[in-house]
Amino acid sequence: MEYRIERDTMGEVRVPADKYWGAQTQRSLENFRIGTDRFRMPLEIIRAYGMLKKAAARANLELGELPEEIAKAIIQAAEEVVQGKWDDHFPLVVFQTGSGTQTNMNVNEVIANRASEILGKPLGSKYVHPNDHVNRGQSSNDTFPTAMYVAVALALHQRLYPAVEGLIRTFTAKAQAFDQIVKVGRTHLMDAVPITLGQEIGSWAAQLKTTLAAVKEMEKGLYNLAIGGTAVGTGLNAHPRFGELVAKYLAEETGLPFRVAENRFAALAAHDELVNVMGAIRTLAGALMKIGNDVRWLASGPYAGIGEITIPANEPGSSIMPGKVNPTQVEALTMVVVRVYGNDHTVAFAGSQGNFQLNVYKPVMAYSTLESINLLADAVASFDAHLAQGIEPNLERIEEHLQKNPMLATALNKAIGYDKAAEIVKKALKEKKTLKQAALELGYLTEEEFDRIVVPMRLAKPHEGA
């Protein structure tokens, strides 16, 4: 491998000749060999940083803080970072300084060297300087949280929201299709009064809508950016209008209403907005756990379980039991949920660890949140495509359970009273008879009266037509 010499304030460093990074990135590579292959800084952060550095160069150009030639080269190089052209030039891990300084400098060095190259200058020449030009008016302390918020907001819009909204559409369609299928309701894991299969699946769609709306509400906090606060929130070394312009340009590029945080001291010292978003994502994940559990119970069997719905058989379920079909998509989804719960704890605890003017757990907060978004998006899309869209009713089993359901007697309360209805249920269960047989033998109702009162669909939709 060929090397070139890069320099920083600590001296000379050998850097691979074909890489755009510089001395500080190389030092970080050598000093933080922690999870190198498994915990790389997410590319979402790198791309967001590219947007930020482009916006910063535009702002500095407008404010007369950078020469036009330098600014335009930075803008071009930063756009190449956004497009993913230099992804393999960002090798650093999450576990570095808690302010994300090494990643900020990795981005600064790559853009500076690429911009210098665009202007016909050799790598390492610092014709475009990583600190004086690319990082002008900035600190790692305000740029990393800015890139973090931009990255998470974009990941929500590009990954999580479409996946969950797709599953909501699937459940809504299934709810409409199965609206006339009456089945046993269940509370406390015990038989209860009837509902329709459509009502049951419709409740899943409603729960997802509610929890997704909460994520979207919490996302609004991410629009408040730390940029312009520089090292401690005072804005030292930044033009007074710099942060405002950067936020404006980021809003233009992303289509999201980014703005400068009202209090940039708080924006550096705490990241409660991200903690709130992650908490809402965890709540959404909890809804998916509930739905997944419902699905696997309803599909359990085929003979010794509930078996009221069927799900697609995507692959053999067992290496020893021939013909077995397992709810594998549910199991994958719920394992992701467990991971998200762990990540939420990481983000919540990390968010509590700000000291004075800076929280120094930013990279792990960013990584954990982005991992949760990406895992959930993938798992929900997989669950939707390979399971939810293939849910079908097992009409024979549904009817069998419905006819045996003693809770149909609830419909008799108004006609004969709670006590007599309970007596009918006890007799039916003890003597293994239908409710109708028990009611007739006790003489509390005629056959005509029973048939008129105990209508399962009317129990499931008592107010329809009212």
From Swiss-Prot:
Residues holding substrate: 99-101, 129-132, 139-141, 187, 319, 324-326
Annotated positions for site Important for catalytic activity: E331
Keywords: Cytoplasm, Lyase, Tricarboxylic acid cycle
Xref: CDD domains: Fumarase_classII
UniProt keyword annotation of Iron-sulfur present: no
Reactions catalysed, as given in the entry: (S)-malate = fumarate + H2O
Active site residues according to the UniProt entry: H188 (proton donor/acceptor), S318
Any single GO BP term: fumarate metabolic process
Subcellular location: Cytoplasm
Pathway(s) where this gene product acts: Carbohydrate metabolism; tricarboxylic acid cycle; (S)-malate from fumarate: step 1/1
GO cellular component, as recorded: cytoplasm
Residue spans crossing the bilayer: none
Entry-linked HAMAP family: FumaraseC (MF_00743)
Subunit-level organization: Homotetramer.
Protein name: Fumarate hydratase class II
Species in which this protein is naturally found: Thermus thermophilus (strain ATCC BAA-163 / DSM 7039 / HB27)
